[in-house]
């Protein structure tokens, strides 16, 4: 009788359309990939700069999206999370079974946010290092 067998997930299709339009407005996949590489590179450069922060992934296995690292002690990690939250950063506490710090810098996370986080990390190291 010409009826559809199911109802398409209209809201999901609408949201996917918005995401695709956003991606195109950013220059497409190549531009988004390059931006993600720059963001991750800035954060990893800070982690590797002095040894105060220690990356948890091997260099050839580092994620561009979820950057994990440790501080010299669990006490300092707790201070880092508390002070970073007070400074406006959210969700940096690592996984409950692993600990440490996890910065999630997904596609829509702005490069300025990474610059701000790196600045916070440098100030934290000066204060507590």
Label for each model-derived stretch:
Residues 1-45, 58, 128-129:
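Active-site C-terminal subdomain of aminotransferase-like
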């Amino acid at each position: 009788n010409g009826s559809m067998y199911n109802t398409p997930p209209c809201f999901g299709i609408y949201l996917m359309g918005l995401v695709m339009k956003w991606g195109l407005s950013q220059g497409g996949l190549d531009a988004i990939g390059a931006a993600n590489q720059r963001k991750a590179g800035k954060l990893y450069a800070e982690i590797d700069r002095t040894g105060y922060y220690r990356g948890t992934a091997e260099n050839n296995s580092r994620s561009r999206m979820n950057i994990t690292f440790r501080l010299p002690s669990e006490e300092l990690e707790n201070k880092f999370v508390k002070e970073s939250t007070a400074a406006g950063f959210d969700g940096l506490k690592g996984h409950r079974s692993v600990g440490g710090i996890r910065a999630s810098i997904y596609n829509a996370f702005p490069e300025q946010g990474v610059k701000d986080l790196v600045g916070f990390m440098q100030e934290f190291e000066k204060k507590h290092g």
